[in-house]
Amino acid sequence: MPKVRTKDLIEQFQLELVSGEEGIHRPIDTSDLSRPGIEMAGFFTYYPADRVQLLGKTELTFFDTLTNDQKQERMKALCTEETPCIIVTRNQDVPKELLQASRESGVPLLRSSQTTTRLSSRLTNYLEGKLAPTTAVHGVLVDVYGVGVLIIGQSGVGKSETALELVKRGHRLVADDSVEIRQEDEDTLVGSSPDLIEHLLEIRGLGIINVMTLFGAGAVRNYKRITLVINLEIWDQNKNYDRLGLDEEKMKIIDTELTKITLPVRPGRNLAVIIEVAAMNFRLKRMGVNAAQQFSERLMSAIELGNQE
């Protein structure tokens, strides 16, 4: 089922439906827009018919210079079975040739009072958000000191309990159990909760709790950009865990690589505090302060000094 249809644009941007009502359920499959200026001149070889078409003042002013036959020919070519809609901006008068072509082809003809540039920007942002690649990850997403921390790990390792402790310490829950993730651009992943389980947290032995009801509206968020992944796993004595923090592990979600930290779980370890420190340390690294690197440099300097003596 298409994520976006023409009728969604009409409702979202309060567009006036001039004609082509039978086509308002046409799907929109791309966030790219088209301003058919060169098509107005008669070049339709590479016409992107599957895009939303925007007709601004420039296009319609040039259109007025054409002959009557050219006007009819261009507008018929503009309205295809693939075209989701044509939007006339600035509340300009709709050419009668376009109105006729819209009625014959069933292409929705819409009108907006906004400028072409402004409407183009808003349409692009809206469509990119709706049509972005998505996936779902089993885990918990928490906003810790402004860092979107995705906590993953096998079932029963203590993800929800750790999230509860973080919420109790003043941080904000975004999603528990299932995190819906969409890629808004090349390096931006935004996580949110499915509507059915929004603001809910499942604690084994306690059941399902409503975080917003218990801790208030300040304890939850609807969505958050994900920048750090914490992987919880049962402590394995035969595995060598990172003790310096020099080697940075990565995890790929959709097309974006995120920093991943593996935390071994064993009795007595306060995971909530460790995750808080991991989030703060991550922010420091992004600001150029790397404690592990500084220690390594000091160690190498001490070794070199010792060798000289």
Curated annotation (Swiss-Prot):
Signal peptide span: none
Region (Important for the catalytic mechanism of dephosphorylation): 264-269
Reactions accelerated catalytically: [HPr protein]-L-serine + ATP = [HPr protein]-O-phospho-L-serine + ADP + H(+); [HPr protein]-O-phospho-L-serine + phosphate + H(+) = [HPr protein]-L-serine + diphosphate
Its EC number(s): 2.7.11.-, 2.7.4.-
Gene3D superfamilies with a match to the protein in the record: HprK N-terminal domain-like (3.40.1390.20), P-loop containing nucleotide triphosphate hydrolases (3.40.50.300)
Active site: 138, 159, 177 (proton acceptor), 243
Region of interest called Important for the catalytic mechanism of both phosphorylation and dephosphorylation, as start-end residue ranges on this chain: 201-210
Cofactor: Mg(2+)
Matches recorded under InterPro entries: HPr(Ser)_kin/Pase, Hpr_kin/Pase_C, Hpr_kin/Pase_Hpr_N, P-loop_NTPase, Ser_kin/Pase_Hpr-like_N_sf
Alphabetical keyword list: ATP-binding, Carbohydrate metabolism, Kinase, Magnesium, Metal-binding, Multifunctional enzyme, Nucleotide-binding, Serine/threonine-protein kinase, Transferase
Binding of ATP, residues: 153-160
GO biological process: regulation of carbohydrate metabolic process
GO molecular function: ATP binding; magnesium ion binding; phosphorelay sensor kinase activity; protein serine/threonine kinase activity; protein serine/threonine/tyrosine kinase activity
Positions of Mg(2+) binding: 160, 202
Keyword Endoplasmic reticulum: no
Protein function: Catalyzes the ATP- as well as the pyrophosphate-dependent phosphorylation of a specific serine residue in HPr, a phosphocarrier protein of the phosphoenolpyruvate-dependent sugar phosphotransferase system (PTS). HprK/P also catalyzes the pyrophosphate-producing, inorganic phosphate-dependent dephosphorylation (phosphorolysis) of seryl-phosphorylated HPr (P-Ser-HPr).
NCBIfam families to which the protein is assigned, alphabetical: hpr-ser (TIGR00679)
Extra information: Both phosphorylation and phosphorolysis are carried out by the same active site and suggest a common mechanism for both reactions.
Domain remark text: The Walker A ATP-binding motif also binds Pi and PPi.
Subunit structure: Homohexamer.
Family: Belongs to the HPrK/P family.
Protein name: HPr kinase/phosphorylase
Source organism per UniProt: Bacillus cytotoxicus (strain DSM 22905 / CIP 110041 / 391-98 / NVH 391-98)
Phylogenetic lineage: Bacteria, Bacillati, Bacillota, Bacilli, Bacillales
Gene giving rise to this polypeptide: hprK
